[in-house]
A protein has these predicted regions:
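Short, Lys/Arg-enriched N-terminal segments with co-localized hydrophobic residues
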Residues: 1-10
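TPR/TPR-like alpha-solenoid helical repeat scaffolds
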Residues: 52-55, 87-93, 112-127
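N-terminal alpha-helical interaction modules that lie
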Residues: 9-38
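Charge-rich, low-complexity segments
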Residues: 116-187, 193-196, 203-434, 443-450, ...
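Alpha-helical adaptor scaffolds
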Residues: 23, 35-91
Length: 462
């Protein structure tokens, strides 16, 4: 009857309230006893999930997994089910499997703080350093097949080749972009993602000796002076027929680029702009484009002083050298100084007055409470961190002594730990009114901590 159905719903609500009350009080055994008292045949999806949660909370992760597997068909599109699967696998040290479930939970219910934190912790426990080594092991194991793909390209379906190679680059992270070409060239692509300029060079650095004489790996597209034709948006565009002008700003040390090509300029503005940027990156290379091109706009006619796109790379390099500037294509090689007004704030870094960095966007995000770059780096198993130590700011002379100590310690960490063991990069440092800071990008957090703690213990005064 309808009254019986209503009574069952009320009883279910009372049951849920009781279970939630016990869970909040950490009385998970009571939850287990109650739900185990219901026969499996009568336990629904929700009751089974709550029982699995209780087993997770008492550390019986294998039992939780068995229960969750029994409701997989319904659970795969459920946030809680995916979270609980990830939770059990995480505490069984099965981090890669756990990561896939937490990632799915995040897709289903974005921005849950617990899910995001578990994703971060999973990534840290699958460090970039070990991912890189796994990729190279895969590449060496499959080198013969990869060579055949280069030598007999016409015999391979491109989609099949891409899927095969994605098995290897997928060991590094999801959505790694690459291109494999003639002459055994393998090029990773940063696709405008700044953090990859700091990660991919290490990937190339770890290439096994057995591959070095034959294969040519690039951390990002290096550019070319050779012209070619590109099919895009139904157009066949010859690079020689794309005309450009580059105006140099010596204060900013960058270029504003304008372009004209009849077909490109007939496209809607967003399409034309996007198509040109693809061409420019291919010709200039991703490093030069990212470092030195600050603005791109199209013109409605061929203007005086314009020249063919293939000559742009040479023009930029010559202009920089003529102005006494060193040509540095990777942003990680360029350090800049910055000054800030110290703030009254108990949180670290808000006391900073002056610093230097080769990753300005990351430093900015520290103060914006923005984790975008932090999470993008974490996605690869790397970690942006800073070490801080307090000091007594009693005089300018004492501050100089502290600054000299920071420089010496940075040098020591870089030479003895980062360079020797390939554990990361020094990104810069800063001094504030209360603390000193050293910024790092780590390729293996656990490995770094194990090495750096004995060094830091040598300086008990800090």
């Amino acid at each position: 009857s309808i009254s019986n159905k209503i009574e069952n719903i009320i009883m279910d609500d009372k049951l849920k309230q009781q279970i939630n009350s016990w869970t909040k009080a950490n009385e998970d055994r009571k939850v287990i006893d109650l739900l185990e008292g219901i026969s499996p045949a009568e336990r629904g999806f929700e009751e089974t999930g709550l029982l699995a949660r209780a087993y997770n909370y008492v550390g019986e992760y294998e039992k939780a997994l068995v229960l969750l597997e029994s409701i997989r068909e319904v659970g795969e599109q459920d946030t809680n089910w995916n979270f609980r699967m990830g939770y059990a696998l995480y505490y069984l040290d099965r981090y890669k499997e756990a990561l896939s479930y937490f990632t799915k939970a995040d897709e289903l219910t974005p921005e849950d703080v617990d899910t995001i934190e578990f994703i971060r912790q999973c990534n840290i426990r699958i460090p970039f350093k070990s991912r890189v080594d796994a990729f190279w092991a895969w590449f060496v194991q499959n080198e013969a097949e990869l060579s055949r793909m280069v030598e007999k390209r016409g015999e391979y379906d491109s989609e099949t080749s891409i899927r095969f190679i994605e098995q290897g680059v997928g060991l590094i992270a999801k959505n790694v972009h690459f291109n494999i070409g003639g002459n055994y060239e393998f090029t990773f692509s940063v696709e405008g993602e700044a953090h990859l300029f700091y990660l991919y060079p290490y990937l190339i650095y770890r290439m096994p000796e057995s591959l070095r004489d034959k294969w040519h790996f690039f951390p990002y597209n290096p550019g070319t002076d050779c012209s070619f034709e590109l099919k895009i948006y139904g157009l066949d565009i010859n690079m020689e027929e794309v005309y450009v002008c580059a105006k140099y700003d010596d204060k900013r040390n960058d270029f504003a680029v304008s372009f004209y090509e009849k077909g490109l300029c007939s496209l809607p503005e967003n399409q034309g702009h996007g198509a040109f940027c693809i061409m420019m990156e291919i010709m200039l290379g991703e490093g030069l484009s990212y470092r030195y091109v600050s603005k791109v706009e199209r013109t409605d006619r061929l203007e005086e002083g314009m020249f063919p796109l293939p000559a742009l790379r040479g023009y930029i390099v010559k202009t920089l050298k003529d102005n006494g500037k060193e040509v540095l294509e990777n942003p990680k090689d360029v350090f800049v100084s910055y000054q800030l007004d110290p703030e009254e704030n108990d949180e670290l870094r808000y006391d900073v007055a002056i610093g230097s960095t080769n990753f300005s966007n990351l430093v900015s995000q520290y103060y914006e409470n923005n984790t975008t770059l932090f999470d993008k780096i974490n996605h690869y198993g790397a970690q942006a961190v800073f070490l801080a130590f307090p000091y007594n700011n009693i005089s300018a002379e004492h501050q100089k002594t502290i600054l000299d100590f920071r420089y010496a310690l940075e040098d020591r960490i870089e030479k003895e730990i980062l360079d020797t063991d390939g554990l990361g990069l020094l990104l810069g440092g800063a001094i504030g009114t209360c603390c000193c800071y050293m910024d790092f990008l780590l390729y293996d957090v656990k490995g770094f901590i194990e090495k750096v703690l004995p060094v830091l213990r040598e300086y008990p005064q800090y």
